[in-house]
Regions:
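Helix-biased detector of long, well-ordered alpha-helical tracts
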Residues: 2-187
Length: 187
């Protein structure tokens, strides 16, 4: 696997340096995950609270006149993935929730796997300060970028153990089961 990130900016719009990275790795034998592999009955797990990065960027870029103690959720994900893989290989989807946040990731997976998604809104972890800012600005935290969060879909009988493992990792203390994959309204 090779992945990377690029930025596109108009001439004269950049006043500093962009640092980008490329990651290379391999998928372990016996592991088969992807956006097309979500299955009805899978639990939907998020590795932590949502919307913090997007909220942080909005507050830094725009002059809303709002002061809030919100920090980005930027975090390395490799150790979290490794911990989950050491718990079980019975995983169907692992996706970062960067662009468009958890909501967009769930929409894309539903479309790619031709399944439905049922969320329990009360189970989605959102930091109080992010809730407050989103409430004032009329934003939905599920659709704000997350730079250190993943969405995992796995069989329901594995979900509690996965969440228990995640909560032992330094960047996923607020991991939670937030819903399930269904056959209702596929795609």
């Amino acid at each position: 696997i090779v992945s990377g990130d690029t930025k596109v900016a108009g001439k004269g719009q950049v006043d500093g340096v962009f640092i980008t990275t490329t990651g290379m790795g391999q998928i372990e034998d016996g592991v088969n995950v992807g956006g097309t592999l979500a299955q009805p009955g899978d639990a939907i797990i998020v590795t932590g609270d949502v919307g913090r990065h997007g909220c942080t960027i909005l507050l830094a870029r725009e002059d809303f006149g709002i002061e809030a103690d919100v920090t980005s959720d930027c975090a390395p994900l490799w150790n979290t993935v490794e911990a989950v893989m050491n718990t079980t290989h019975d995983l169907h989807v692992i996706r970062d929730a960067t662009r468009g946040g958890v909501g967009t990731v769930l929409y894309e997976i539903a479309e790619q796997s031709n399944v439905g998604i049922r969320l329990d809104a009360a189970s989605v972890p959102v930091a109080p300060e992010v809730k407050g800012v989103c409430g004032m600005l009329g934003l939905e935290p599920l659709y704000l970028a997350c730079e250190g969060r993943m969405v995992i879909m796995a069989p329901k009988d594995k979900a509690d153990k996965i969440v228990e493992t995640l909560r032992q990792c330094p960047y996923s203390k607020d991991a939670a089961i937030i819903g399930e994959v269904t056959t209702d309204q596929p795609g």
